[in-house]
A protein has these predicted regions:
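Expand to "…catalyze enediolate/carbanion chemistry for C-C bond making/breaking, isomerization
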Residues: 2-559
């Protein structure tokens, strides 16, 4: 099963279609990518095909279950903890002890897997680098495959390079590098450039499978003293403990297939859906031999609330997104429950993102933003988190100082059980308690950020600087879903008295595109994908039926 894609737009690997069903037929339909043959080896492709054959039916069942669960929430208008798993929540159990490389996670940096980011993230001084194939990556075939090549090159010490402008990028000594934790795509996304038996593989199977196949043994051979001494993962968009169970079974299968000791893999689950927030114990329990912790998201969590309660009435209408902070009562309840759950079970609790991009041109903006970042990280450290995320290397020392002040020489604060007061379902769902208002300014910001992000995503960029913030797909999701929610609930905007309507959104969108055309100039504007982005933005914001993920209708536009 050779994988040189340069000879044909579609290569068939493996057995002919008439062969035994025991032999998978694999088709690589992606465009040529330099050095793809180093990643898409016959053995690696067969490994991914094995994951597909073993687990694709269950993935599809779980995706169907998401729709059933959403219908149940719509009918009930609420959520609660699962009665059938009360014994797990009440039980006395812990997850496996974290390996040495994951004991101290006080600062984690996130970003895509392009060559420049690989070097900068590993050198950043952060303890962990979340190498992102998910929300910070636009999943072009080039990005997906080159990202895998770049990670292998980093481990092999051949990632150094010099730009055309003469700037050199080189890794520090291995002991000074961040530990890599890879985030594959969520269960819902297909990879249309690799088919098994005529069916696209899950992006999750491809991202996880290629990385694990090529690097698991390599990392273990480096020894426990090395920061990169094991295969570690972040699991996104998990909606239930059954989805965590599937990941655990994938891990068990993968380790057995490659002769890697059981329990070598460690995974941190992002609690970025409202349904997962009600199943934190259960999620850790399903992954207990492979679990490393839980992470508290923000934009995707709010997006999930809108998605699930979009027709549940005024109580669930989110105000301007920038007014909803992690200190809002319902968000504070969610983070409190996450810290309590993690520390009770011996897992790390990792805080949210500081997305600010420092500017050398505007010291006043920098000073105000860095003060806000410091306050956020001080709060997280004081609330019991064991670490937190940043999006830019310049924020690493800011976050580290906040956690150093609380942790000192301790690697974490898992021995702190957190507040003893239980968190209730009512507290998690008290959206109205956030206060705030819905405004035209907030609506305009949602349009501005949404259209800018989608256009960049269509050009292959997944992490995009917008208004001094590093944004990824989660920001676009909350932006477009809030627009949908406000329109369908007849929200009246507090600052102007206008009603949120599709017509108003189209007016704001047209004005924004005109401003962008004037700002960029005709040539640069014409070279972009603004018209396609505008059509897609209208589709996912204004359609009668709510689109589960904007990336689903966007994916075919990537080519």
């Amino acid at each position: 099963m050779a994988a040189d894609q340069g000879t044909s737009p579609s290569l068939r690997l493996g057995a002919p279609a008439s062969a035994s069903p025991a032999v998978p037929v694999v088709t690589v339909a992606g465009p040529h990518v330099d050095r793809a043959e180093e990643v898409l080896t016959p053995e690696a492709v067969a490994f991914v095909a094995g994951l597909h054959r073993a687990f694709e039916d269950r993935r599809q069942e779980l995706l169907a279950r998401r729709k059933t669960r959403r219908a149940e929430i719509a009918a009930a208008g609420t959520l609660d903890f699962l009665p059938g798993t009360a014994d797990i929540r009440a039980g006395d159990w812990k997850v496996a002890e974290a390996p040495r490389a994951l004991q101290d996670r006080r600062v984690e940096i996130t970003g895509p897997t392009d060559r420049k980011m690989v070097v900068n993230a590993l050198n950043s001084g952060a303890r962990i680098w979340l190498a992102d194939f998910e929300d910070a990556t636009s999943p072009t075939w080039e990005n997906v495959i080159s990202g895998q090549v770049n990670l292998i090159d980093a481990y092999e010490g051949r990632i150094d390079f010099t730009t055309a402008a003469g700037k050199a990028y080189a890794l520090k000594p291995a002991a000074e590098l961040a530990t890599v934790v890879v985030r594959p795509r969520g269960w819902h996304l297909d990879e249309n450039h690799l088919l098994v038996d005529g069916v696209p593989v899950a992006g999750a199977f491809l991202d996880f499978g290629l990385y694990f196949f090529h690097n698991a043994a390599r990392l273990l051979a480096r020894g426990a003293e090395d920061p990169n001494s094991g295969p570690y993962f972040y699991l996104p968009k998990t909606e239930s403990h059954l989805e965590a169970r599937l990941w655990n079974d994938v891990f068990t299968h993968a380790q057995a297939e490659l002769g890697i000791p059981y329990g070598t893999i460690r995974a941190t689950v992002l609690i970025e859906t409202i349904t997962a927030a009600f199943e934190m114990d259960e999620i850790l329990y399903e992954l207990r031999d492979h679990a490393a912790g839980l992470n508290a998201g923000r934009w995707d969590y709010l997006f999930s609330i809108v998605k699930n309660f979009r027709d549940a009435g005024a109580h669930y209408i989110l105000p301007d997104r920038n007014s909803v902070t992690m200190a809002s009562p319902f968000m504070a309840a969610y983070t409190r429950l996450l810290v309590q759950t993690c520390h009770k079970r011996g897992a790390h609790a990792i805080g949210g993102m500081a997305a600010f991009i420092p500017s050398r041109k505007d010291p006043e903006v920098n000073a105000a933003a860095l003060e806000k970042v410091k306050a956020d990280k001080d709060r997280e450290a004081g609330n019991g988190f064991d670490g937190s995320w940043v999006a830019h290397p310049d924020l690493v020392p800011v976050a580290r100082a906040s956690f150093d002040a609380v942790l000192g020489e301790r690697p974490n604060q898992k021995d702190d059980p957190g507040p003893s007061e239980p968190v209730t379902a009512a507290q998690l769902l008290d959206i109205a308690g956030a206060g705030g208002t819905c405004t035209r300014a907030g609506l305009r910001n949602a349009v501005q950020v949404g259209i800018r992000y989608i256009e960049a995503w269509l050009r292959g960029l997944g992490a995009v600087g917008i208004f001094h913030m590093m944004e990824d797909a989660a920001t676009a999701e909350i932006s477009r879903s809030q627009i949908w929610q406000w329109i369908h609930n007849g929200v009246v905007l507090a600052d102007t008295g206008e009603k949120a309507t599709a017509e108003l959104v189209r007016t704001l969108l047209a004005a924004e595109l005109a401003e962008l055309r004037a700002e960029l100039g005709e040539e640069a504007y014409g070279a972009g994908r603004w018209s396609e982005a505008a059509r897609l933005f209208e589709q996912v914001s204004l359609a009668e039926e709510f689109e589960d993920f904007l990336t689903l209708p966007a994916l075919p536009l990537l080519g």
